[in-house]
Amino acid sequence: MKKLIILCLLMPLCSVMQATVSDSDSIALMRIYKEATIGEIVVKGSRPLVKVENGMLHYNLNALSEKKNVSNVFEAIASLPGIMEKDGALSLNGASSVSVILDGRPTTMTQEQLNTLLKSMSVDRVVNVEVMYSAPPRYHVRGAAINIVTKRAGVYSFQGELKAVYQNQYFSSCEGGANFRVSTPKMAFDLMYDADDVKTMQHYTMDSHHTYQNKVYDISQSAWGRYKGWNHSLRAAYEYNISDKSLFSMAYTTLLSPSDNSVNDVTGNYQTSRLDKYMRSYLHNVSVAFQLAFGLKMSADYTNYHSVNSQLLQSDVNEEDNQLQINGGQDVRKISLSADQTHSLRHDWTLDYGISYVNAYDKDNQYYTDVKGSMPTADTDTRLTEQSTDFYVSCDKTYKSGPSFSLSASGEYYTIGNYHKWAFYPQASVTYFKTPKHVFILSLSSDKTYPSYWQMQSSVTHLDGYQEIRGSSHLRPCSTYSLNATYAFNRKYTFSLFYEDAEDYFTQSMYQSSERLALIFQTRNWNYSRQYGLVINAPFSIGTWFNTQLMAMGLHQHEKCADYFDIPFDRNKWLYQLSAKNTFSVSPHFNIQLDGMYTSPLIQGTYDLTHLLDVDASVKWRFCKDKCALTVRLQDIFNSGLPKTKVNYANQKFDMNTTYYQRSLSITFSYRFGGYKGKEHKEIDTSRFGH
């Protein structure tokens, strides 16, 4: 079975060697064909689904998803060329991180919270998706970004969708949702609700050869973690077309987790333990935006997040009984304001300038009560106020053929506690378009990434009798500089060279303590993390029954930290990644999808991570005049989509295997109704929390 599936994944690699490209293929990067029969004459037409404009890749998400087995906006974006999804997060090949934004406006929700919203959003709510390696400053994000442009009011219509999902990943669970949209030429109202019954099982094994006081202790343990809880998401949005070029919109989003429970049992030759944890949280977000005819856009976004948790840890460490009762919580209030002005000048020049302000207040606490034994504890009760003021100016020049460019400069004044910092961010994008067959894009961007509020606390959280998480109050933000060059051939194949330098890069890693027998998880700053490489994307099809999106990437990693506990490191490694997203159209209403990705061994600090192979399969059947759809999806078929972690560096030596129970099955049924449309109306121009 495994050999058969791998053979199917490799088939397009062999077939593309013999493929020829017709002249009509140059019309669009990816295309769909429609046949209209007039008597005995068959007329074939095509419409472009992707175009390159101002350094961006514009995707028609609805058209691309017609033959993809996707059930929501998040899954549809993950199916785009060069975009991957892993562990609930999106990534863009050639970029270490990517921001996801909605309708080009900043939000105070975290990326994880925004992803939760996208998973409850129907694909037909989206007009197109913009993918860029250097986001223009008017989006108020830096570096690589994915902008999701949603539908505007313009016709009389009433549409809706109901869905039900069965999931199994060791445990069985369910999910249900509904969304409705009512629109007229002047206004539109959207309502979405999703309820997800989450049940997961996690299992890992670890062998730690811990050097302490010139003696090596062999510590082995196995852990089983069970989690269950309900997640609710609700979004209501309203927009009003003041005029053809003026728009008012507002939206309310709430994410609720009223009762999450988890249990983690650990057995081993050094310690046994049990950790019971209870948590509840809620998030409320309100956003308001104005777009006026003379080019002014204003927006305001407010988020209120609250969580409380209670933990009871009972452990037997080296024949010593320990017990810790831990109570904690977090409150975050965050507001974002922005104003942007656009001037369309003579000779296709455009001038943009704007300002944004973000203010966040974070309250964190964690208290130890009912302490028994000798395990170290540290209470935490902190307040943080974070402020950021950004301003920018941007100049664009567009030509019908030849070079088009965008140049901008942004300034930022950032404060948190007693830390104050001015920063300057240059950005440039040049697009050279001579013929439809040859398009060049060169982009330069800079960015700064800040650690989460909880990571910056001087806290200690025990996972069991051997492992603990430590906060880092002196964490510095990471400054990233990126350069990307992309060549699009025949509007079909893309070749991208990239370089990225992340100074003061930070990530969480494990360290065997030299002071006592403890495995420490801590987020620390490194000197830098640098990478450069090449990404190739190549779509290919055979008739109308098969199409694939092939991707190959070669990447060089270089990571250095001169102040990593007592073992500085300076390491580098080459790696490669191959992927194929294959769709077999058995009939107009039945599709089979088989996706695979292979990544060679890689490094992360002192870690050596093994290779991984992630293979997914799905089938989708549309019936009842395409109003109903049934999708069956099997993810990580071979349970090999996560790497194993090995460390054998200086006095650090341990192995950890977390690859168990990654395979999952889901069955999704959806029903769409409505769809009546009146006469067309001119379309509006739509050019960090938690413990």
Stretches found by the model and what they are:
Residues 74-109:
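Extracytoplasmic beta-strand/coil segments of soluble accessory domains associated
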Residues 187, 231-257, 275-426, 431-437, ...:
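Face-selective signature of the C-terminal outer-membrane beta-barrel domain
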Residues 623-691:
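C-terminal beta-signal and adjacent terminal beta-strands/loops
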Residues 139-146, 154-204, 229-232:
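Outer-membrane beta-barrel translocator/receptor signature
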Residues 28-31, 40, 73-76, 114-116, ...:
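N-terminal periplasmic accessory domains that precede
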Residues 21-63, 87, 95-97:
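Short, acidic, small-residue-rich periplasmic hinge/interaction motif at the N-terminus
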Residues 107-133:
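Short acidic/polar hinge/loop motifs at secondary-structure boundaries
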Residues 448-497, 501-503, 519-533, 538-541, ...:
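Outer-membrane beta-barrel signature, preferentially recognizing the C-terminal barrel domain
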